[in-house]
Amino acid sequence: MEKLRPRLCEILIDSVEHGASVGFLSPLDPASADAFWRKVERALADQQCILLAAELGDGVVAGTVQIDIDTMPNQPHRGEVHKLLVHSSARRHGVGEALMKAVEPVALAAGRWLLTLDTATADAARLYERMGWKLAGVIPNYALNPDRTLTDTTFYWKQLEKG
């Protein structure tokens, strides 16, 4: 992951600069982005999460998504999808959809057949609904957008076929 971290930082910073509500405020400095990915790296080493990455064919990572599998003992079947990030230069090329499709078999392989996620953007909500995710509900004024305005957050779930 050491080799990928600079590109992952670029994707995170770019996503925040383009308004993605992913837990960070704009402007996101490189040191904070690097600290985030180092934390993800530790979670990967501790088998608390799974990281997927996608390329557009040029060998450069265009997007990522994570599956949090660090659940409580009574939820060994559940995973939470986090941080679907696609660099702005790669948007509208199917990267997000490809990553979300890839999440499902990977989650199942990890024994996770009930997935949850949340999103603040209508574009992502349309993608999730098109892919069979079910609306759980909306919480108003849940978080701050990168520009510090309040935004609602929509929660989704999906039960996967256990093959």
Predicted stretch roles:
Residues E2, P27, Q75-R78, H93, ...:
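Non-catalytic, surface-exposed connector residues within folded enzymatic/regulatory domains
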Residues C49, L150-F155:
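Short hydrophobic/aromatic beta-strand or adjacent loop that forms the aromatic wall/cage
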Residues M100, A107-A120:
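Conserved GNAT acetyl-CoA-binding A-motif
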Residues T116-D118, A125, E129, K134-D152:
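Conserved catalytic-core motifs of GNAT/GCN5-like acyltransferases
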